[in-house]
């Protein structure tokens, strides 16, 4: 029989060895010869090293090396020749950038350096091959990690960029997983007061969002996905908080959200059912059924 004492791990010693390995891999990112393996190892360990983001950000040449990985594959985007190997490698670099994007110590500097903009060419791609799909999904993951923090500075930054039309395009034609992350990003932008005001500021912006959400509802009625539907309903509910958008939604909310189309999909999802009921209630409140009931403007 083994004694428990010998089987017990020695966390401090192991942690120290791991720490030395982390430093070594970060150093190896600076050299093109050792970078690929270092990217792979660090991306595998990123969940278990809480302060990896500051280590990456403050170490010499590391962020430049990660950006070089991204820029290196721009030529493979158009014409679309990206291989699985290239995609895996750059996605490891993106995973490390996601780590920097979501850490409170490095997030502001990450935004100030406009690093998300380096990812936008990937979100512009339309090729349906797996390497491109993986690239888009991982890039969306970086933006998703940013908005998940619920920080005002993130929304303020994103609104100065083209992220909304990029997300809308992916919501219309991406894979189910990409659509889900893109819709989550839009939802997070809408849940911010500045984001909601921005989208409802012009009819063009609102109608673009409403049109894509409407198409998604139609698609979801044919190929249901409870997870994706949840985000779509939340986007609609949030839009209904804006008086002008609420007025427009009374005309353009898809019938499938008003009838029993999704009853089966949502039977166990009390949260989404509650949101949907609230949405319908919001659109009914203060509604004038007879236009003759609207007072005429003063002559």
Curated annotation (Swiss-Prot):
Family label: Belongs to the CNOT9 family.
Gene Ontology MF term list: epidermal growth factor receptor binding; kinase binding; protein domain specific binding; protein homodimerization activity; transcription coactivator activity
PANTHER family, per database record: CCR4-NOT TRANSCRIPTION COMPLEX SUBUNIT 9 (PTHR12262)
Gene Ontology process terms (BP): cytokine-mediated signaling pathway; mRNA catabolic process; negative regulation of intracellular estrogen receptor signaling pathway; positive regulation of epidermal growth factor receptor signaling pathway; regulation of translation; regulatory ncRNA-mediated gene silencing
Coiled coil: none
Keywords carried by this UniProt record: Acetylation, Activator, Cytoplasm, Nucleus, Repressor, RNA-mediated gene silencing, Transcription, Transcription regulation, Translation regulation
GO cellular component: CCR4-NOT complex; cytosol; nucleus; P-body
Protein name: CCR4-NOT transcription complex subunit 9
Record's subcellular location: Nucleus; Cytoplasm, P-body
Residues modified as N-acetylmethionine: 1
Induction (record text): Up-regulated by EPO and EGF. Transiently up-regulated by retinoic acid in F9 teratocarcinoma cells.
Pfam families noted in UniProt: Rcd1 (PF04078)
Tissue expression: Detected at low levels in bone marrow and thymus.
Known partners and oligomeric status: Homodimer. Component of the CCR4-NOT complex; distinct complexes seem to exist that differ in the participation of probably mutually exclusive catalytic subunits. Interacts with MYB, ATF2, RARA, RARB, RARG, RXRA, RXRB and RXRG. Identified in a complex with ATF2 bound to target DNA. Interacts with NANOS2. Directly interacts with ZNF335.
Function noted in UniProt: Component of the CCR4-NOT complex which is one of the major cellular mRNA deadenylases and is linked to various cellular processes including bulk mRNA degradation, miRNA-mediated repression, translational repression during translational initiation and general transcription regulation. Additional complex functions may be a consequence of its influence on mRNA expression. Involved in down-regulation of MYB- and JUN-dependent transcription. May play a role in cell differentiation. Required for retinoic acid-induced differentiation of F9 teratocarcinoma cells. Does not bind DNA by itself.
């Amino acid at each position: 029989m083994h004694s428990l004492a010998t089987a017990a791990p020695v966390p401090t010693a192991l942690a120290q060895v791991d720490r030395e390995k982390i430093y070594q891999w970060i150093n190896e990112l600076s050299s093109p010869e050792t970078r690929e393996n270092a990217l792979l190892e660090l991306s595998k360990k990123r969940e278990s090293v809480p302060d990896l983001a500051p280590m990456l950000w403050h170490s010499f040449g590391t962020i430049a090396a990660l950006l070089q990985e991204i820029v290196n594959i721009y030529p493979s985007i158009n014409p679309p020749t990206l291989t699985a190997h290239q995609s895996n490698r750059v996605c490891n670099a993106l995973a490390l950038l996601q780590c920097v994007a979501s850490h409170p110590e490095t997030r502001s500097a990450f935004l100030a350096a406009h690093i998300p903009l380096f990812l936008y060419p990937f979100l512009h791609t339309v090729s349906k091959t797996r390497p491109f799909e993986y690239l888009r999904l991982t890039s969306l993951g970086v933006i998703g990690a940013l908005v998940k923090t619920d920080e005002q500075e993130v929304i303020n930054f994103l609104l100065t960029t083209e992220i909304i039309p990029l997300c809308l395009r992916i919501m219309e034609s991406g894979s189910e997983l990409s659509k889900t992350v893109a819709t989550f990003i839009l939802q997070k932008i809408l849940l911010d007061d500045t984001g909601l005001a921005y989208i409802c500021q012009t009819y063009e912006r609102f109608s673009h969002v409403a049109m894509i959400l409407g198409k998604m509802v139609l698609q979801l009625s044919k190929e249901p996905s409870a997870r994706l539907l949840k985000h779509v309903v939340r986007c609609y509910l949030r839009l209904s908080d804006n008086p002008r958008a609420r007025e427009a939604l009374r005309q353009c909310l898809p019938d499938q959200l008003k009838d029993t189309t999704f009853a089966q999909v949502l039977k166990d999802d009390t949260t989404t059912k509650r949101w949907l009921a609230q949405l319908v209630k919001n659109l009914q409140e203060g509604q004038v059924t007879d236009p003759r009931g609207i007072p005429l403007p003063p002559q």
